[in-house]
Amino acid sequence: MSAHRDAIRTARSVVVKIGTTALTTPTGVFDTSRLQDLADAIEARMKAGSDVVIVSSGAIAAGIEPLGLTKRPTDLATKQAAASVGQVALVNTWSSAFGRYHRTVGQVLLTAHDISMRVQHTNAQRTLDRLRALHAVAIVNENDTVATNEIRFGDNDRLSALVAHLVGADALILLSDVDGLYDSDPRKGNARFIPEVDGPDDLEGVTAGRGSHLGTGGMVSKLSSALLAADAGVPVLLAAASDAAAALDGASVGTVFAPRKERMSARRFWVRYAAEASGALTLDDGAVKAVVRQRRSLLPAGITALSGRFYGGDVVELRNQDATMVARGVVAYDAAELATMLGRSTSDLPAEMRRPAVHADDLVAV
């Protein structure tokens, strides 16, 4: 067993993401028996001493039958209505499943926007931490009634990676209808299974297939989220929900994504991945080198242009002359104020404007 698999096996704090297809029949009907089986596997892991936070998809699927619909809706309003009805059924089923073990569950509805805002980010973190301290099982889902982008893309994959870092998890386990990563679509034959991803070189030549019609995620979404979590320092296991018990027990199933050696700080993770960028700064070549290679602060002299309506304390993208993002950071000035400082050396500026435009401590290269 590799060191990374062993780290997942022994992790004290685990986030388990469960996709829509893991909770439905092949025809898209919400399947309570599948959820109960997953709860049994998760209970075994918790009984062994791990804290587990569940990120559960399936609200829209769970709302189809109660609303008398014959298939998953395609229009946004009906999706949101189905999510509203289905979320009740979803959480009640989780509550019943864990009630057999005398455990209490708590519902936490989030959107990517919630996590992008620093105050909401902190509140969500505090709530999840307190639920775990009170020995309740947190059931996290995206708030589909308002999160229009999340309904269309991701199936909670990205949210699970954000939650894993939010709660300081030691491991992230992604469970769906795929048993791991392949170098091409396994449904077409001749695909090579990839048991472990240690870095970008292992993904050379990999082509991700499309997702299932029952959910909104796909291999592209799962791969992106796994790499996000791994880059932040969290080991990831991608496995089939049918292998949930084995995956949670540390068996050699699925694909493991090795984490970076040093875990990213909460603030740097928020700047890099969670925060929404409010604008962009275009840098000259010298500033790009200073920011990316030398990890130095960005001075107004190195900025050639800006865009967006941002204020001091907002996160902005830093771009090179080809408009490629090279870093993200927390800007110190409002857009209107910074516009008067572009290209000017620090010595030419008034004393109150001699702070860096973006301090090195608030910069994350991408």
UniProtKB/Swiss-Prot annotation:
SMART domains: PUA. It is found in: Cytoplasm. ATP binds at residues 17, 176-177, 216-222. GO terms for biological process: L-proline biosynthetic process. Its EC number is 2.7.2.11. The keyword Amino-acid biosynthesis applies. GO terms for molecular function: ATP binding; glutamate 5-kinase activity; RNA binding. Keywords: Amino-acid biosynthesis, ATP-binding, Cytoplasm, Kinase, Nucleotide-binding, Proline biosynthesis, Transferase. Pathway: Amino-acid biosynthesis; L-proline biosynthesis; L-glutamate 5-semialdehyde from L-glutamate: step 1/2. Substrate binds at residues 57, 144, 156. InterPro entries: AceGlu_kinase-like_sf, Asp/Glu/Uridylate_kinase, G5K_ProB, Glu/AcGlu_kinase, Glu_5kinase, Glu_5kinase/COase_Synthase, Glutamate_5-kinase_CS, PUA. Residues 278-356 form the PUA domain. The keyword Amino-acid biosynthesis applies. GO terms for cellular component: cytosol. Belongs to the glutamate 5-kinase family. Catalyzes the transfer of a phosphate group to glutamate to form L-glutamate 5-phosphate. This is Glutamate 5-kinase. It comes from Mycolicibacterium vanbaalenii (strain DSM 7251 / JCM 13017 / BCRC 16820 / KCTC 9966 / NRRL B-24157 / PYR-1). The gene is proB.
